[in-house]
Regions:
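Concave beta-strand-loop units of leucine-rich repeat
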Residues: 29-43, 49-65, 74-108, 112, ...
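C-terminal motif of bacterial Sec signal peptides marking the signal peptidase cleavage site
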Residues: 18-21
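Major-groove DNA-contacting interfaces characterized by cationic-aromatic clusters
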Residues: 70, 436
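Bacterial N-terminal signal peptides that target proteins for export
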Residues: 1-9
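Bacterial lipoprotein signal-peptidase II cleavage site
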Residues: 23-27
Length: 500
């Protein structure tokens, strides 16, 4: 029995010794620092066996996405790495880079800069990138300052260059390559194209090409146009009583193309058709093309006139006034054969319209005159409908005496700015007159033919006269504007023979 116990004890000792031999030490547990040039994410995943890893040196590795992912998932490990840019390796927290031309390509540069989150300045001396390529960099990195220089005309110039002299070059020498370089100078504000002797190697079409490329730069340039010296700085260009004709339009267009400061281009009686000039004006709205229109032999005005006063005209004769889009005051009254005011459609600024004693039948063209304040339709017996005036919400005064065809004035009730409505001799029912007084409490509605002093017709109290029998101030102002006391009509001051 004693022998069996001894054997059991021996076996137990042997088992204990065997068990102690199974607890072999793991050397990976001792790894706290590690250096590796990783090829990909898989190589970094293998590092997970080092559970006690504290520092990891990955300099020389190019798998930046994998490195950044590893850092995010292993905050306990201090990782050191670098980023290869144009053949040189930089710490990922680098703030400034200076890259020599020829050491980088745009796509590779854009890709690698994603891994430089603290980069704030990029220096590119003598860069070979184009303006469009530089714009791509700025678009992808809007907070990045990009400074660069370019080689231009044998010199190295900075992107902040503001002035350049091209007067010594020919138009042919300003080729596409040079144009691309110029486009890389966003701060360029002045380009000299005139030599000291006042000559230039550039034609207007060449200047236009430069302006298209450098929209923010002023071109210092002058040229001859129909015997007149014109400069790109001119704000006004005027030609008067000079035969230019329709054939001169291409030259005029070439000039307007390079006159960015011109706000007034006058072609007064230059033998150019109205339709041609209207198209020119439409194509160059900023230049305000102005010309003279003629009608019925004795009348003529510039197209930018604000006042027109003429009488005894026909509708077809004043059709030419459609080119006068700035008219504010229009008197075409006392015209027995005037049957349309279609022309006012083209006068959006019109405030006063006088078409008394005419055969007009339709007021709808006034729909395009939202600023209309005064309307005189005295003795316009063919008018029947006032509804188009509903759109003229700024109307203050209407004289419709002897407009016998009008029997309904209810469309006027909505015109809350009305101050005077003179009905005079008319076919408006008495009940409607009273209703108008109620519906338009702020308007002086008058249907009297004459006042107690015997003042006659449209001079009656309630229109041109105040209650005291004196001329109203608004009418005195209009007399001056239309120059009634001078018996003025448009074109009277200056007799001009129209060039054709």
């Amino acid at each position: 029995m004693k022998r069996i116990s001894s054997v059991l004890l021996s076996l137990m000792l042997i088992a204990a010794l065997l068990l102690c031999g199974c607890e072999k030490h793991d050397p990976n547990l001792d790894v706290v620092d590690y250096t590796l040039v990783a090829a990909d994410a898989a190589a970094l995943q293998e590092l997970d066996i080092y559970v006690n890893l504290q520092t990891l040196d990955l300099r020389g590795s190019d798998c930046y996405d994998a490195i950044e992912s590893y850092i995010a998932s292993h905050p306990q490990v201090k990782v050191t790495y670098d980023v290869a840019v144009a053949g040189t390796r930089y710490a990922p927290d680098v703030q400034q880079l200076k890259l020599e031309d020829g050491t980088y390509e745009l796509e590779a540069l854009l890709d690698v800069m994603k891994h430089l989150p603290k980069l704030d300045t990029l220096e590119l001396p003598k860069t070979g990138l184009t303006a469009d390529q530089l714009a791509v960099i700025r678009e992808n990195f809007p907070n990045l300052t990009v400074n660069y220089t370019v080689e231009l005309l044998g010199q190295e110039v900075g992107f902040d260059l503001t002035e350049i002299d091209l007067s010594g070059l020919t138009a042919e020498e300003v080729d596409e390559a040079l144009m691309e370089k110029l486009q890389m100078l966003p701060n360029l504000t002045n380009v000299q194209l005139m030599a000291e002797d006042g000559t230039s190697n550039f034609a207007p079409v060449d200047v236009k090409r430069l302006m298209d490329v450098l929209p923010g730069a002023a071109m210092n340039y002058s040229f001859e146009l129909f015997g007149k010296t014109v400069t790109t700085a001119d704000e006004r260009v005027e030609f008067k009583n000079q035969m230019i004709g329709n054939d001169g339009i291409p030259e005029i267009r070439a000039a307007l193309d390079i006159l960015p400061n011109c706000t007034y281009f006058l072609l007064d009686n230059c033998g150019i058709d109205n339709e041609v000039l209207a198209e020119l004006r439409e194509d160059y709205p900023d230049a305000k093309v102005v010309w003279r229109v003629f009608w019925k032999k004795k009348y003529h005005v510039l197209t930018d006139t604000e006042m027109i006063n003429c009488n005894g005209v026909r509708s077809e004769e004043i059709e030419v006034l459609k080119y006068c889009n700035d008219v504010v005051y229009l008197d075409i009254g006392h015209s027995d054969y005037l049957d349309s005011i279609e022309v006012v459609k083209y006068m959006p600024k019109l405030k006063v319209c006088i078409c008394v004693d005419s055969k007009i039948t339709d007021l709808s063209p006034l729909v395009n005159c939202p600023d209309l304040e005064v309307l005189e339709i005295v003795y316009c017996r063919k008018l029947t409908d006032l509804s188009p005036l509903v759109n003229c919400t700024k109307l203050k005064g209407i004289n419709m005496s002897m407009a016998y065809g009008i029997k309904d004035i209810t469309p006027l009730y909505s015109l809350q700015n009305m101050e005077r409505l003179y009905l005079g001799s008319n076919n408006i029912p008495e009940e409607m007159y009273k209703e108008a007084c109620e519906k338009m409490p702020n308007c002086w509605v008058s249907n009297s033919w004459s006042d107690s002093s015997g003042v006659y017709r449209n001079y009656a109290v309630g229109w041109r006269l105040d209650r005291g029998g004196t001329f109203s101030q608004w009418y005195l102002d209009l007399r001056q504007i239309f120059r009634y006391t001078e018996y003025y009509y448009s074109g009277k001051e200056e007799r001009i023979t129209q060039l054709k």
